[in-house]
Amino acid sequence: MTIHYPNGNPYKDGTQFSSQAISRPTIYGGRGMTLEEELNISNQYYRSIDKAVVYKKPTPVQIVKVDYPKRSQAVIREAYFKTPSTTDYNGVYRGFYLDFEAKETKNKASFPLKNFHQHQIEHFRRCLKQSGICFVVIRFATLKRLFVFPAGRLIDCWDRQPDGGRKSIPLKDIVTNGFELHPQLQPVIPFLDGVDWLIETKVGNVRG
């Protein structure tokens, strides 16, 4: 099935392979899973112990071509995303609304702002105005380092670009203004540790 973005470009989710077997490279921690897969597993764990309710957002799709090889079966051949996606995940934790994006890079010294889109930045702005807890889970794959980075800081970096600001966020700034995560067995990515830090910073609550 071919799925297209609103601008007509074909969508590639990394799950379509040639007939030859292709092994997925180990991106981080020797597990061979993508950042998104690890976050999905972590969210399942958090839900199983009733600690947080967080899900990956579904993306609306408009079906434009369907084949019926059998009367009782339908095969979708072509579809389009109805609207640009906002962010990857949202949910509730400790009474706070969470909204966040997951990004990774092979760069060692900085994180490129081109990995974000204007509509995602505007979505973060709107959520922050409603007192949401908004952030990005950033992975430096080559360095094997993982951070929770506040959306407010991301927006500041984004807004400085037209005035000659950097096109990337230096790693040292992410270390200074973010919260470093340390992968473990369960959950794989303990991102709620970073959320606790954001909540403390925002409202002065004591962790736990």
UniProtKB/Swiss-Prot annotation:
Its cofactor is Mg(2+). Keywords: Cytoplasm, DNA damage, DNA recombination, DNA repair, Endonuclease, Hydrolase, Magnesium, Metal-binding, Nuclease. Its EC number is 3.1.21.10. It is found in: Cytoplasm. Pfam families: RecU (PF03838). It is an enzyme of class 3 (hydrolase). It catalyses: Endonucleolytic cleavage at a junction such as a reciprocal single-stranded crossover between two homologous DNA duplexes (Holliday junction). The keyword Lipid metabolism does not apply. The record marks K103 as: Transition state stabilizer. Mg(2+) binds at T86, D88, E101, Q120. Transmembrane segments: none annotated. Binds 1 Mg(2+) ion per subunit. It comes from the Bacteria. One of its GO terms (molecular function) is endonuclease activity. GO terms for cellular component: cytoplasm. One of its GO terms (biological process) is DNA repair. Belongs to the RecU family. Endonuclease that resolves Holliday junction intermediates in genetic recombination. Cleaves mobile four-strand junctions by introducing symmetrical nicks in paired strands. Promotes annealing of linear ssDNA with homologous dsDNA. Required for DNA repair, homologous recombination and chromosome segregation. This is Holliday junction resolvase RecU. It comes from Lacticaseibacillus paracasei (strain ATCC 334 / BCRC 17002 / CCUG 31169 / CIP 107868 / KCTC 3260 / NRRL B-441) (Lactobacillus paracasei).
